[in-house]
């Protein structure tokens, strides 16, 4: 089996964690496990994994521990937001910590039924891992024409354990947004403590005709965590989806967003902000298929890299043969804050249709000394001047958050990751 030297040990451990659940697992979960074992783990020789270090994770002793937390512990980690909140701890749904959903506009059922779930747009090994080890699926539905008054907040709390063991938690959600429906869904990932843990996340979303989705992801886990996520968006005709990801925490954080525009006149916006500090690595990946004509997509991905951090961006737009009048743009802007900070960026276009308008671009730079000088000349000290420029760089993304309270909490998290902040 191709892969890292210790990959067989990691695969065996994950296999044991799967078998520890007994015979109650779905056939689909078993199929993903078999695919995981057949595929093996990649090495740096694999192009898509060249810049994502796995050694620190693979050499671990994995456990699956379901902890109990109090409402007070939940509240200490929670967002201040008027929402319908579902709480998951160490991969498991906790009704006692969650809000009731009756009358909310969201129909929620949690089970291991996976027969109706969409196939992966871009499958890879950690997607198979999460699909196999996630113990249940959160099925969420918003009926035709419904517009829930409050956003749905999916809060994920994962604990690390003392010693060399790494707690492993996997979360699997699916949302069906029916024709003409409109909803906001927020994914919030936090750590219960400062110890190492490994989070896997998978969220698939069907956006039906004339439906409108606002999706926000907040990855705020601790500096020792590993986080691998795979979100799939499938849009029908005249559908709209806006997805905003703020990737602000984790030793290694790799987030994949894969999208299919399967109906004409659909509109897509995908934005992300990554801020690796110290020795952290944040890898952001997008895969977009323009499968029908007359669709519009815009992507803006920004990174602010400090110390010895590394940011990776890999994005691809694929325009199918008959997807005429496609309008797609993808931009990746990177700001280096440390002399040893690194960025690796690879935006790509694959166009098989005529009469389209597509572009991609990437920039990598540092703070302009003239900007600092201008602010210093007006009595602003060096650190404050630097922070003003960074906030301005991030503002294009944070301003997309409609809720002012949520925006301020994201800005506070950004502030913690700036030079001088409590990282």
Swiss-Prot record:
GO cellular component: iron-sulfur cluster assembly complex
Membrane-spanning residues: none
One GO term (biological process): response to oxidative stress
Pfam families assigned to the protein according to its UniProt record, in alphabetical order: SUFBD_core (PF01458)
Highest taxon of source: Bacteria
Subunit structure, interactors included: Part of the SufBCD complex that contains SufB, SufC and SufD. Can form homodimers.
Similarity annotation: Belongs to the iron-sulfur cluster assembly SufBD family.
Functional summary from the UniProt entry: The SufBCD complex acts synergistically with SufE to stimulate the cysteine desulfurase activity of SufS. The SufBCD complex contributes to the assembly or repair of oxygen-labile iron-sulfur clusters under oxidative stress. May facilitate iron uptake from extracellular iron chelators under iron limitation. Required for the stability of the FhuF protein.
Protein name: Iron-sulfur cluster assembly protein SufD
Gene that this polypeptide is encoded by: sufD
